[in-house]
């Protein structure tokens, strides 16, 4: 059991429960590159560790509910594939913005940030910024993705922007629920001149 039924996607009410080993087995049956497979597994392990701590149990006893559903596995695997295809060397995430208040999950009403998000951001030293927006802006899956790929918190002094992408969440808030990512190339002598970089800004993931 976990808090992942607050995931921003719409799911049916019935999902099977899968352990980490079962999810690993599903990922291994796909035709992913070695790097994409490792990243997908890393994201799920971060989630499992956070849920294990939240429930005071061992990681082997964690069974995913919503995050174990096929569509959520596809979400994480798709991210891993796209990330691998971009050949990104460094990821800059200064912090992520979170909402306030409470949410309802299978365990009842719990405060925002939910325990799994707190555990991930604490374990990986990810800075959270509070907003006045009522609701959950950061899901455990989103926090796990940031934890899995972030390498730095501050941009290089000199860089050029190659591409910019936006992803909009389905929930309606006072401010746009948008994730922005920039693919940049560093002009710093300390980094490979041809290194592709990504910089994540806003968050509703």
Placement of each model-derived feature along the sequence:
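Short, hydrophobic/aliphatic alpha-helical segments
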Residues: 48-62, 87, 91, 127
């Amino acid at each position: 059991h976990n808090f992942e039924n607050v995931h921003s996607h719409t799911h049916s009410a019935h999902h099977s429960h899968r352990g980490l080993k079962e999810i690993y087995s599903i990922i291994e049956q796909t035709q992913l590159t070695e790097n994409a497979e490792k990243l997908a597994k890393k994201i799920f392990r971060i989630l499992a560790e956070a849920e294990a701590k939240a429930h005071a149990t061992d990681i082997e006893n964690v069974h995913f509910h919503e995050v174990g559903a096929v569509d959520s596995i596809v979400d994480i695997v798709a991210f891993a594939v796209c990330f691998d295809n971009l050949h990104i060397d460094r990821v800059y995430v200064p912090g992520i913005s979170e909402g306030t208040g409470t949410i309802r999950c299978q365990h009842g009403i719990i405060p925002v940030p939910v325990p799994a998000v707190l555990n991930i951001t604490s374990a990986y030293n990810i800075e959270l910024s509070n907003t006045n927006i009522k609701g959950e802006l950061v899901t455990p899956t989103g926090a796990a993705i940031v934890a899995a790929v972030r390498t730095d918190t501050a941009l290089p002094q000199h860089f050029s922007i190659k591409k910019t992408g936006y992803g909009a969440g389905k929930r309606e808030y006072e401010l746009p629920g948008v994730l922005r990512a920039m693919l940049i190339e560093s002009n710093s002598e300390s980094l490979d001149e041809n290194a592709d970089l990504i910089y994540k800004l806003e968050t509703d993931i």
